[in-house]
Design a protein with these regions (language model features):
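Short, surface-exposed loop and linker segments with low hydrophobicity and enrichment for Pro/Ser/Thr
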Residues: 1, 33-38, 111-113, 258-261
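Feature activates predominantly on carbohydrate-active enzymes
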Residues: 2-4, 10-13, 17-20, 24, ...
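Short, well-ordered secondary-structure micro-motifs within conserved domains or adaptor modules
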Residues: 31-54, 64
Length: 337
């Protein structure tokens, strides 16, 4: 069958959605692409839809895939491919039933129950993507997107993916696994299954493991590239970092500013307490925490964040009211009527 894809949206995620649709149509149906097509796919961003909703509409021999955002449009592409029989997983993809372009599903709309769907990735373990080569880490992110995930959170411990100051000392990024060294065991089966040879880390770093400056630069480059892939795949990107209670406030501010400069891709920066809770003997009061937010991020951004919390029925840094624990209302689908 000859197929044509017409894309109205021009952003990077919409372009990626077109490439993904073409890739899987070619892979599983052997479709040819060009003029005089028997079937046309139209990819559109429809701003009348909520940003996380999507669906498709038939018009004669044309199927229009639309989403309330470019991210939702990409989700629509994967949803359609899933309906056609493609099963996506972190291990790859396969067909769970015969793939037939002649049996495309009828017009349908989708309103996901969760606006943001994704995982929180503490990239600090020898067995996770912390020890993946860059190409494999990028493909892992793409596979998450193909499974319908549109958000991801990366957590960086101090000194791992971002530098920090300890008094007068600057601790560079690239201190993987809290600065501990995890040697690869001399086991043939394990060696065949991992990409490292001497020590667990980003495999490209093994050759420069003893050169802190080069190691730091590549660590930041690696995570930045993985973030770029997540953004192309339409993901809402969060980076979380820990604030140590024993660290002077000025040093924490410096660390936050450097993180923002190193990773401009992020949509949300989370400031969290140290693992295990840390020392809470001198917690910030609500006014102090609000003042810190305004100082770090400016009045407008801080007020928007505080207002968002209030709209969700929560007072910032306060107790969650009992009404917040009630079951959420069903999703609004009135825009489809």
């Amino acid at each position: 069958m000859t197929v044509q894809i017409c894309r109205a949206a021009t952003g990077p995620t919409a372009c990626y959605a077109e490439r993904e649709l073409k890739r899987y149509l070619r892979k599983y149906s052997g479709a040819a692409f060009g003029e005089g097509a028997e079937l046309t796919f139209r990819l559109e961003v429809d701003e009348s839809l909520p940003a996380h909703c999507y669906g498709w509409r038939w018009e004669e021999s044309s199927l229009t895939l639309r989403g309330g955002s470019e991210s939702a449009l990409l989700c629509c592409v994967y949803q359609l491919l899933s309906q056609l029989g493609v099963c996506f997983s972190t291990e790859g993809d396969f067909l769970k039933k015969p793939f037939a372009l002649g049996s495309l599903p009828e017009s349908r709309d989708f309103s996901p129950y969760c606006r943001y769907r994704g995982v929180r990735q503490h990239i600090n373990f020898p067995m996770d993507i912390s020890a993946y080569p860059l190409g494999k880490a990028k493909e892992y992110i793409r596979r998450l997107a193909r499974m319908g995930m549109n958000a991801i959170t990366f957590h960086s411990y101090n000194g791992q993916w971002h530098p920090y100051h300890k008094g007068e000392e600057r601790v560079p990024a690239g201190h993987f696994f809290y600065g501990q060294r995890h040697a690869v065991p001399a086991d043939p089966e394990l060696a065949a299954a991992v990409d490292n040879r001497r020590a667990f880390c980003i495999p490209e770093v093994e050759a420069i493991l003893e050169e802190p400056d080069k190691r730091e630069r590549f660590a930041v480059y690696w995570l930045g590239q993985v973030m770029d892939t997540a953004k192309e795949a339409g993901m809402r990107l969060t980076l979380s970092v820990e604030c140590q209670e024993s660290t002077p406030l000025e040093e924490e501010k410096s660390m936050v500013r450097e993180v923002l400069a190193l990773y401009p891709q992020i949509d949300v920066l989370e400031l969290i307490t140290p693992e295990g809770g840390g020392d809470n003997s001198q917690p910030l009061s609500s006014p102090e925490a609000a003042a810190l937010c305004r100082e770090l991020f400016g009045g407008g951004a801080a007020e928007a964040a505080l207002q968002s919390l209030r709209q969700e029925g929560r007072e910032p840094w306060g107790e969650v009211p009992s009404t917040a624990l009630d079951a959420p209302p069903p999703p609004d689908t009135s825009f489809f009527s």
